[in-house]
């Protein structure tokens, strides 16, 4: 906070100098942009950079516009950021794919080239590599697109990540190479378990390049990439360790990294929630939300939708949870993005929690087609959690007699899909869904059998909260001393984690019983 305040004071001085008509206003605007970026005020920094660009020419103006686009995209101002980015791409001679098909074709082409390239030699010879300003400008533009589009357009982000890595390899410059490898690793890891080996290779190469460059930002991005790989594959605690280490480096050694910090914080909170550490997650979330509001950081606020929603649910504050989902839905707009997905998961959860099963079921049905046709459908974790959330809403509806036959068939289909999924935690969620469906059908033996299969898998997947829900449901069905022991164990979990209304949480996360 003290550092941010110091940068804001510096920004005030630059503004005063500009207002007084000091010479070289383009330089003052650029320094104003840097001070604001250092303070975490990305949108304001972008405006200052654009002012500097309007007073500059040639490559300098292009670079200032690139920095403006970077901060706009990473502070949640996607439409304007994309408009400026496309101009920058034109300036440096990079094509923007006009269709998803064009992006896929480019991804395939660049990945084929990269697979026959060594990731090590450029790092070893980097210190002797010539610096081609045009090549570096092309890399910087491609990297801005790759990182800035991750949330709003995964396909084009992956395309530019491949191009940025190819350019970094050609340039042989270790700082840029480390950054490119980190972003590429995150994109590859999103595809799930079949891409694990390639993602790990990219992370290790990113770490080597960062060490070669002795650059803290490249090192933080390598740690962030490692966190993403762990998270996308369901390794919540390993993800948290890497992400928290990245946050430490970013805070202590880097400037103008509000976007990177937001990513470490949001995904750490998600990892805490999924592993069942609800008390710690809900302790962190309010200050992070307030910090994002203070900075007017729409990106961070939108990314915090689910953690903020969970925080209010744990406190049994339904109205506050619903307000979070309404704000997210109002901001999302346009084509289906990660923001829409987060709003869907949050809203459906709140609807089930408060007993609006018809609303949750309707939402689950309406999301299927937009999700399937979006680039998010390429993300294994998104596919798995979407199937699970849709299945939960279907079971809750069927249990209440809403569209019972269709809802049960949908839930069972989604459960079978999860049971066959190669991402480690998905089968556990599939068995939990099947247990709910069997219970709605009145088949207690099969419900118990499904819960018996689900519980060890949930524990192995470190899905602590869902394991507690499944344990309660199994205990309720079993009855007797054994059943009471299971229920009491879950009650201790809910009490330890500060859950105010476990009964409603069970209706939300393990319906049908």
Identify what each model region corresponds to:
Residues 1, 29, 36, 72, ...:
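Residue at a conserved register position within TPR or TPR-like alpha-solenoid repeats
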Residues 26, 33, 69, 146, ...:
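Conserved small-residue packing positions in alpha-helical repeats and bundles
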Residues 404-467:
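Generic long, charged, amphipathic alpha-helical segments
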């Amino acid at each position: 906070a003290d550092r941010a305040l110091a940068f804001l004071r510096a920004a005030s001085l630059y503004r005063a100098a500009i207002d007084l008509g000091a010479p070289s206003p383009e330089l003052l605007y650029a320094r104003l942009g840097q001070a604001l970026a250092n303070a975490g005020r990305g949108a304001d920094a972008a405006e200052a950079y654009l002012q500097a660009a309007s007073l500059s020419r040639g490559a300098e103006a292009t670079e200032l516009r690139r920095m403006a686009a970077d901060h706009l995209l990473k502070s949640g101002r996607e439409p304007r950021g994309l408009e400026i980015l496309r101009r920058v791409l034109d300036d440096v001679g990079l094509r923007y794919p006009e269709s998803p098909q064009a992006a896929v074709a480019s991804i395939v082409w660049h990945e084929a080239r990269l697979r026959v390239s060594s990731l090590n030699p450029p790092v070893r010879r980097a210190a002797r590599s010539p610096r081609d300003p045009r090549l570096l400008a092309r890399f910087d533009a491609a990297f801005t697109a790759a990182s800035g589009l991750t949330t709003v357009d995964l396909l084009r982000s992956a395309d530019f990540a491949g191009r940025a890595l190819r350019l970094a390899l050609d340039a042989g410059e270790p700082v840029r190479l480390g950054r490119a490898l980190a972003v590429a690793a995150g994109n590859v890891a999103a595809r799930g378990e079949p891409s694990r080996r390639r993602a790990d290779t990219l992370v290790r190469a990113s770490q080597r390049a960062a060490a070669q460059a002795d650059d803290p930002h490249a090192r933080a991005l390598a740690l962030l990439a490692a966190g993403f790989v762990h998270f996308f594959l369901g390794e919540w605690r390993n993800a948290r360790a890497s992400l928290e280490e990245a946050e430490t480096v970013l805070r202590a050694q880097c400037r103008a990294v509000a976007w990177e910090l937001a990513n470490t914080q949001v995904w750490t909170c998600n990892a805490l929630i999924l592993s069942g550490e609800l008390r710690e997650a809900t302790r962190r979330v309010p200050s992070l939300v307030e910090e994002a509001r203070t900075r007017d950081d729409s990106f961070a606020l939108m990314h915090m939708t689910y953690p903020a929603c969970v925080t209010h649910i744990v406190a049994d504050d339904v109205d506050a949870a619903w307000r979070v989902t309404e704000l997210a839905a109002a901001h999302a707009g346009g084509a289906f993005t990660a923001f829409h997905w987060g709003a869907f998961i949050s809203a459906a959860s709140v609807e089930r929690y408060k007993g609006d099963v018809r609303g949750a079921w309707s939402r689950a049905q309406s999301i299927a087609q937009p999700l399937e046709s979006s680039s998010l459908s390429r993300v294994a974790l998104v596919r798995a959690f979407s199937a699970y959330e849709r299945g939960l809403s279907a079971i809750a509806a069927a249990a209440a007699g809403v569209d019972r036959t269709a809802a049960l068939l949908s839930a069972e289909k989604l459960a079978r899909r999860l049971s066959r999924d190669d991402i480690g935690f998905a089968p556990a969620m599939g068995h939990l869904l099947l247990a709910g469906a069997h219970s709605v059908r009145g088949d207690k033996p099969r419900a118990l059998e499904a819960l018996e299969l689900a519980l060890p898998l949930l524990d192995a997947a470190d899905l602590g909260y869902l394991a507690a829900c499944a344990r309660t449901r199994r205990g309720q069905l079993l009855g007797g001393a054994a059943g009471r022991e299971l229920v009491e164990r879950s009650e201790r979990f809910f009490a330890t984690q500060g859950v105010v209304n476990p009964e409603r949480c069970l209706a939300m996360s393990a319906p049908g019983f």
